[in-house]
């Protein structure tokens, strides 16, 4: 009969527990997997599969599991995973911001529904753009690149409790400007054309006051906006590809700055 000693149990716990925390933190904040529609069992099972695949290749550590230092180490692993997943969310937040701006210009800001992920009201156009970005993310194998970056963190910042560089987290907060910058850049063509249309409607109202601009303007703005969205669709894929590449480069820079040397 196979007998397992307490030292072996602690060794296995030390080998798999710390990577599991980092992987779980990433899955809990990463795009797609962080959706509430994904069952918790699926998230846990995927995290365990990834952990069992990468843990045997990691350098051994002798951190006491039941100690105050282990508590700090657990917090550190969770922070690293959250930083990776949260940064990746910037790309999708930029696309959602573009959808909200476009919907506001088209007069669709009142058309909202409950987002199943956050349980908050989200404009319909923003949700459509978000779903399109998710599909493009899978098409570009973004999920595989994200897992690859996660594996790289175990070599750049091995499990051992080394202090983290606070400048890396400062760079993460500054990177939030990418949300508004890229969102505005994506929506800028439609903003310009719809603003021109609104100016033309304003001049028409001054020239012919008997015309009801509210009756004419809303369907005209909506029709032109939908037509412009259809024309913009072929450009969304290369834009999202560039946006994902920019975020992955940002992630690589943050990972390289995390160790405090």
Curated annotation (Swiss-Prot):
Keyword Amino-acid biosynthesis set for record: no
A cellular-component GO term for this protein: bacterial-type flagellum
Compartments (UniProt record): Cell inner membrane; Bacterial flagellum basal body
Any single GO BP term: bacterial-type flagellum-dependent cell motility
Membrane-traversing stretches: 13-33, 45-65, 66-86, 90-110, 131-151, 184-204, 213-233, 235-255
Membrane topology: Multi-pass membrane protein
Keywords annotated in UniProt: Bacterial flagellum, Cell inner membrane, Cell membrane, Membrane, Transmembrane, Transmembrane helix
Broad class of where this protein is predominantly found: membrane
Family, as annotated: Belongs to the FliR/MopE/SpaR family.
Biological role stated in the UniProt entry: Role in flagellar biosynthesis.
Name of the protein in question: Flagellar biosynthetic protein FliR
Organism: Escherichia coli (strain K12)
Lineage, uppermost ranks: Bacteria, Pseudomonadati, Pseudomonadota, Gammaproteobacteria, Enterobacterales
